[in-house]
């Protein structure tokens, strides 16, 4: 079973990049070094093999290696959420079962994509994956995979193992409504790095994002401003983060993120 309960998975959670060597193999040494860097700079957990982790360009073996390496390095100090989404349900279940055996604290998945799926198909996908392990499931709502509407999200929240939502969209009014409707035991994570402050003010329990690889400590300060009800201070810090984000997003993602990590001397 997981070491952390869902209500303990909160705060600043980097959607961890996957680090490769020059031969395009997973660089486990760099991965371990990055885990320590992020923990030292305020990370409250890790979200593995998601969009930022380039999961859809990786083999099952590569994804599992990242999971094994990070969980071994973390050694139970912080919660680890593993994204197991894939274009096929069977492969997603295989990834979920591995995450459970490896010691992950929760699993997550984007909805099925490429073809146009009906709400019932998406519901069945999440049902099958969430039932494949005892781990809590975090539904991942993101434009790239096709945003799910509120009715479907509320339906998915009724599945026994679904206990959270990663909401990567700018309509924070909807996110806040979902949190208010489902109550404090259902965890909401804001997924827009450029709107982390807004997300937390709208009721999110934590933030999961790409740029927290670079400066988790800055986002830790943003969350502190939310706790202190310091609106001006929080907005000021968010603007600092946004300057980097908006400049970076003029270039190809996620390669620009790797270049920024190199620029900081981290990768």
Located regions from the model:
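Active-site beta->alpha loop and helix N-cap motifs at the rims of alpha/beta catalytic domains
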Residues: 2-14, 19-147
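Interdomain hinge/lid region at the active-site interface
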Residues: 253, 266-267
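C-terminal substrate-binding/catalytic lobe of Rossmann-fold NAD(P)-dependent oxidoreductases
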Residues: 250-255, 261
